[in-house]
């Protein structure tokens, strides 16, 4: 979340950011509450000072055997006023906190300004989409023909947007996970295997709650949520901690299953692996010095790109516009892989710098020196990559006319075969 002091002293900056993001949060009402809060706080402090003065006078009179009854009654009245004002102050602060949690991050100055994804800017492309001398199939058609993906039986067992991976399909999924973790670990990322359930405070810390609760799977009768991404548990590993400067930067990579309700996506990508309720992903998470976080974003994006390059999958990098930027992000690059069945690029990774937005929510700080005042660090993360979408891209881009799928060279040591089918 944003710093309350920053919002109070820079209301026009925040209003402009909200406008660029097409946010309907009312900052004027929030600022009116802040003004009332400050007045009440001043009144409470004044009354407490008055109560302390009266209390001292009561003590003095009792010490000298003088009557203090009237002052005692006066002190009780002041105490009741303080309680009433503090109750009102608590209500206002609770209301303000709720609004503060609804205010999105302020876009970095380099983010393209625009209403939606149409304003996203292509930064670079890599590779050339393949020209087929036959009619290419969609990944779900390939998977069903090769009997490595079973959507029908998953639908029978669970419902729509679930999949059984079978045989070499399951092995391909597992190979990709190991390949990605190996490559990222070799670059200095420390591997983490996180819990797949977290409690509400963790979801608040990374920004999924309270705003996006309808997109989350909550475990009935508990305070647990199934994680939508490893970003949530890995970022919250350091929640409520003060790190030392020598610990930074921290780089983690983590494989996890991810669970998303996909509320509001009815009718979109209903077939195949593109938009599932459960999918696997390798996540990259960074904790950085504020002054270095944008360099860290560029390197994080390159690390995600390197996986696509080794797999020889054509892709492009898009800088998201203010209207398409995620709620918690200050700047995001999307990596979009070429999918022949769509005849276009589709998102396979989002790499974001949240600056101190998540760190404030999760209270993750660091000290530059042993006795220095703690500061909020910057958090970043990105998919490195989404496994199901990578499977989709491999099946479609590596399909052969005879129905087989060639295994990318980088994966052959993990798969032990050159072809699927």
UniProtKB/Swiss-Prot annotation:
Record's subcellular location: Cytoplasm
Binding positions (L-serine): 229-231, 283, 383
The UniProt record lists the keyword Protein biosynthesis: yes
Protein's name according to its UniProt entry: Serine--tRNA ligase
The protein's enzyme class: ligase
Similarity comment: family membership: Belongs to the class-II aminoacyl-tRNA synthetase family. Type-1 seryl-tRNA synthetase subfamily.
Gene responsible for this protein: serS
Gene Ontology annotations of biological process type: selenocysteine biosynthetic process; seryl-tRNA aminoacylation
HAMAP family per UniProt: Ser_tRNA_synth_type1 (MF_00176)
Highest taxon above the source species: Bacteria
CDD domains recorded: SerRS_core (cd00770)
Catalytic activity: tRNA(Ser) + L-serine + ATP = L-seryl-tRNA(Ser) + AMP + diphosphate + H(+); tRNA(Sec) + L-serine + ATP = L-seryl-tRNA(Sec) + AMP + diphosphate + H(+)
Native source organism of the sequence: Desulfitobacterium hafniense (strain DSM 10664 / DCB-2)
Keyword Ligase: yes
Record GO cellular component, one term: cytoplasm
